[in-house]
Structure formats: C-alpha cells, structure tokens
Amino acid sequence: MKVYEYDNSTEDQREDHDSGAVVSEAALNEIGVLAYHFDSVDDVNALAAERGYKNRDEVTISPSALGDIYEDKVKAFFHEHLHEDEEIRYILDGEGFFDVRSKDDSWVRIRLSKGDLIILPAGIYHRFTTDKNNYIKAMRLFQEDPKWTPLNRDPLVDENAYRKAYINSLPLA
C-alpha cells in the first residue's frame, strides 16, 4: 500500500498521479480511513467478526470480466461520491486506487494491491479506479445485505445525515 497526495493532473485517472508528498497512516486515521495488510484470509475473517461484517462477495473489475461496459463502469466508480455504509475492500489480486478527501478537501490517493484491506467510513467523499493494468479482484465486505449505492457529490448530498455525522466525527484542526 502506498498513500500520497494526488497530483491533480488531468492525465488518465489510471496513472499513479503521485505528487511525491507521502501521507502517513496517522493522517489517514484522522479522516476515519483504516488500512491494513493481511497475507491470509483468516486475518480478514477475524476483522470481519470483530467489526460485525456479516456478508461478503467478490468482484473482478477488468475488460475481460465486464466486457463492453468496463470503461463506463470505471468512469462511474471515479465520480466523486459517498455511501451511507462503510466501504470495505480486501484486494485479492491486481491493483487499484481509492482517492479520498482530506480534511482540507484535497485528494489523497491510496494505491492498493494484493493483501491490502481498506475501510472507508460512511459519509467520506471518495472515488475508485483501476491502475493502468485495468485489473483488480476484490472481496467486498458488508455489515448487512450487500449493496453499493453511491451518492454523487452535490450540495444536497453535503446535507446528508451520514455526511454530517462523518464531518462531526473528524477531530478539530
């Protein structure tokens, strides 16, 4: 896992976009993002039991898995959005990026590869993309029934109860 400030270039979203400014694990934790590396699914199972994740599935994001809808899906995942549930992903194979908003609303890029697990809190604005290899396989974990409902960023979503709860959970500057 590699975490850094996004360079804000308009190049292909699947490029590294590494500004060279490293972001610490402590800084991620301050915005509610938890990151782990597990070599064994047994460790994932232990975390799932501890945090009450009852359901899971697997998803492969690649041109061969998604066919003609691949490019549209990758573009949709890259729209800035939030969820009303935690987003938990354990990377089984391949690589990709989660971009999350920092406290000052800039982008932080998290490069994930096999064995990495990330937990995004409900209400955090984020986006996702594969890397330039166009392939990632991930386990998605859920506290309740599997669902993925994005709320794209706009002024109304800024007033969402989960967004407000997330903002109120952040430590003061």
From Swiss-Prot:
EC code: 1.13.11.54, 1.13.11.53
EC class (word): oxidoreductase
Any Pfam family the entry gives: ARD
Localization in the cell: Cytoplasm; Nucleus
Major subcellular site: cytoplasm
Keyword RNA-binding belongs to the record: no
Cofactor(s) this protein cannot do without: Fe(2+); Ni(2+)
Keywords from the named record: Amino-acid biosynthesis, Cytoplasm, Dioxygenase, Iron, Metal-binding, Methionine biosynthesis, Nickel, Nucleus, Oxidoreductase
GO biological process, one term: L-methionine salvage from methylthioadenosine
Statement: the UniProt record of this protein carries the keyword Hydrolase: no
Coiled coil: none
Disordered: region residues: 1-20
Top-level taxon in the UniProt lineage: Eukaryota
Sample GO molecular function, one term: nickel cation binding
GO cellular component, one term: nucleus
Cofactor remark from the record: Binds either 1 Fe or Ni cation per monomer. Iron-binding promotes an acireductone dioxygenase reaction producing 2-keto-4-methylthiobutyrate, while nickel-binding promotes an acireductone dioxygenase reaction producing 3-(methylsulfanyl)propanoate.
Protein residues bound to Fe(2+): H81, H83, E87, H126
Binding site for Ni(2+): H81, H83, E87, H126
Pathway membership, UniProt: Amino-acid biosynthesis; L-methionine biosynthesis via salvage pathway; L-methionine from S-methyl-5-thio-alpha-D-ribose 1-phosphate: step 5/6
Family in the record: Belongs to the acireductone dioxygenase (ARD) family.
Function of the molecule: Catalyzes 2 different reactions between oxygen and the acireductone 1,2-dihydroxy-3-keto-5-methylthiopentene (DHK-MTPene) depending upon the metal bound in the active site. Fe-containing acireductone dioxygenase (Fe-ARD) produces formate and 2-keto-4-methylthiobutyrate (KMTB), the alpha-ketoacid precursor of methionine in the methionine recycle pathway. Ni-containing acireductone dioxygenase (Ni-ARD) produces methylthiopropionate, carbon monoxide and formate, and does not lie on the methionine recycle pathway.
Name of the protein described by the UniProt record: Acireductone dioxygenase
Gene name in the database record: ADI1
